[in-house]
């Protein structure tokens, strides 16, 4: 059995977990998340702890029990604490501005780039060169951060572009005569 799948998830106070036959829903202060439960995994809620077990002895069921446990742990963390991704703009004249559910970027194109945020995602710009994307669904937060970074990824010679705050960009040397 998967080592990750063996560990139970402690459900914090203020988080409600409902398990149906084919889906699990987690409700907390930051919203509600719903995920289908794989038929190879059985989920039990006992004394405020969620436990996962493979439905049969196959290798796929063992692997899926660990995967489901990790996904549900992210759901529990998301509705209680939330997730955030920070991006940094590097370049002369590069600016970001949050306007409600939209992110307005000026990153060296002849026109400003406007990115709409989906429901449940908040975007903040503490400074003109910083972007903070927050939400309860870890996958959606990471996806939106990747889409924003893809607008102008860091180039390898000067490092200009949009990068994750913790990202290290390795720079190439210029051509020598």
From Swiss-Prot:
One of its GO terms (molecular function) is structural constituent of ribosome. InterPro entries: Ribosomal_uL6-like, Ribosomal_uL6-like_a/b-dom_sf, Ribosomal_uL6_a/b-dom, Ribosomal_uL6_bac-type, Ribosomal_uL6_CS. One of its GO terms (cellular component) is cytosolic large ribosomal subunit. Keywords: Ribonucleoprotein, Ribosomal protein, RNA-binding, rRNA-binding. GO terms for biological process: cytoplasmic translation. The keyword Ribonucleoprotein applies. It holds the Pfam family Ribosomal_L6. It comes from the Bacteria. The keyword Lipid metabolism does not apply. Belongs to the universal ribosomal protein uL6 family. PANTHER family: 60S/50S RIBOSOMAL PROTEIN L6/L9 (PTHR11655), LARGE RIBOSOMAL SUBUNIT PROTEIN UL6M (PTHR11655:SF14). HAMAP family: Ribosomal_uL6_B (MF_01365_B). Part of the 50S ribosomal subunit. This protein binds to the 23S rRNA, and is important in its secondary structure. It is located near the subunit interface in the base of the L7/L12 stalk, and near the tRNA binding site of the peptidyltransferase center. This is Large ribosomal subunit protein uL6. The lineage of its organism: Bacteria, Pseudomonadati, Pseudomonadota, Betaproteobacteria, Burkholderiales.
